Amino acid sequence: VVVLTFNVAVDAIKENSEIQEHYHGSHELHSRWIILVWFILINYITVHLSYSLWESVMAVHMTNMGIPFYAYSMLWTLNGVLIIIGQPLVNKLSPYVRLSTQIIVGIFIFALSFLLLIFARTLTAFVIDFVILTIGEMTSFAGLPAWIAQLTNVDEAGHYQGLLNIMMSVGRAIGPLYGGFVIEKGSYQFLFISVFCLMTGTLIIICLYLWHLHRVQRRLNLDK
């Protein structure tokens, strides 16, 4: 069973090591890539803080608009069906789109769905918005552990991938509390704007720092 089931592809390990060498280049850059990983982890907190709103306050928001609760429940069925159908299609993007680009675009689409909630008043609008959210989820979430593995050394990849799961739990724990507090002090519209700003703000920091690191890496390569 071990021989047949748990074979490890040596070529895959070699390929992953080459990708890591491309990212790190030297020990000098390694600590900077780790800073980027922490920016990604912080962004992941904001993503799941926002996602948890759909599991908590959004049910109340939709029923307050006269939409029956069963319709809210059906949105999660739609989410599951779309992921089952769409995830294999998204995976086919990998030969054509850089992983970091795919994840950044996916998180932005995910964040955009919360901004569009400001204008949602009917069940159709909520369905369209949830489809947009699911597209962002499919495009970004599955690739994050692989991106973390590219940005870290082999001996520390598991540590940071574990932190990714911890940050997800932190975001889900904070989300309902944050949502209830903002709604009590403000409104649902302000809540949607605030989580959009949290996600896009940290995403912009990731993009700027990633651009800076690529510039530094190119300069170091030219100096060799």
Please annotate each region the language model reported.
Residues 85-99, 183:
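Helix-to-loop junctions at the C-terminal end of transmembrane segments
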Residues 139-153:
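Intracellular juxtamembrane helix-capping segments at the cytosolic ends
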Residues 1-17, 205-210:
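C-terminal membrane-cytosol helix-exit motif in multi-pass small-molecule transporters
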Residues 1, 181-199:
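A membrane-interface helix-boundary motif in multi-pass transporters
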Residues 36-75:
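Helix-loop boundary and gating motifs at the non-cytosolic
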Residues 69-70, 152-164:
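Loop-to-transmembrane helix entry/capping segments in MFS-fold secondary transporters
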Residues 8-44, 223-224:
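Juxtamembrane intracellular "pre-TM" segments in multi-pass secondary transporters
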Residues 101-116, 196:
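Structural signature of the two symmetry-related core transmembrane helices
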